[in-house]
Design a protein with these regions (language model features):
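Short low-complexity, flexible loop/linker segments enriched in glycine and/or proline
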Residues: 61, 122-124, 173
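Acidic, polar ligand-binding/catalytic clefts
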Residues: 72, 76, 84-150
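Bilobed "Venus flytrap"/periplasmic-binding protein-like clamshell domains
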Residues: 44-53, 63-78, 112, 132-175
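Short, flexible helix/strand-to-coil boundary loops that buttress conserved ligand/catalytic motifs
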Residues: 58, 118, 172
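N-terminal hydrophobic or amphipathic helices and topogenic motifs
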Residues: 2-11, 15, 20-86
């Protein structure tokens, strides 16, 4: 019995040490982002493009929307100037690579917060600023009133690499 307790204690101690080092490394990486942003003098902010109300550039290159406002708030808080932002338009496919590679400092665009993104990619979500839902649009004259009326071979479109795609696959796989 004593031998088992000793082995368990060793395993727990090993995990505690590994956790301490990994937490220290994550904290160091996060502080480097802030440190590098301050040295650079501007925040590199990843946004979507052409999504009025969220992030959209006009013909003159002036950005507007709630996601843009978040970027400006971060610049004001960290650099003392809300105009110290460089916006980088990113697709759903590009957004996480740009963030994890350090191409951008923060990501402020339509992105669903999921457990797998939190755990697997290692992202830190700061909070939800918009709640949405999902549904299907069909032509008015199609006669389709619900998804139960979809026939085999019905075409459905969505953006690849999004939570919407995964939810749609789950929905149809369950039928």
């Amino acid at each position: 019995m004593f031998k088992i307790i000793k082995q368990l204690t060793s395993v727990v101690a090993m995990f505690a040490v590994l956790f301490a080092f990994s937490t220290e490394t994550m904290a160091a990486k996060k502080s480097k982002t802030l440190e590098n942003t301050k040295k650079r003098g501007f925040v590199r902010c990843g946004v979507s493009q052409g999504l009025p109300g969220f992030s959209n550039a006009d013909e003159s290159g002036n950005w507007t929307g709630i996601d843009v406002d978040v970027c400006r708030a971060v610049a004001a808080a960290t650099l003392g100037d809300a105009t110290k932002v460089k916006f980088t338009p990113l697709s759903a496919k590009e957004r996480f690579t740009a963030l994890t590679s350090g191409e951008i400092d923060i990501l402020s665009r339509n992105t669903t917060w999921t457990l797998s993104r939190d755990a697997d990619i290692g992202l830190t979500f700061v909070g939800v600023n918009f709640y949405d839902g999902q549904g299907f649009m069909v032509r008015k004259g199609s006669g389709i009133g619900s998804t139960s009326e979809f026939k085999n071979g019905t075409s459905v479109c969505t953006n690849l690499g999004t939570t919407t795609e995964l939810n749609m696959r789950d929905f149809f796989d369950s039928k």
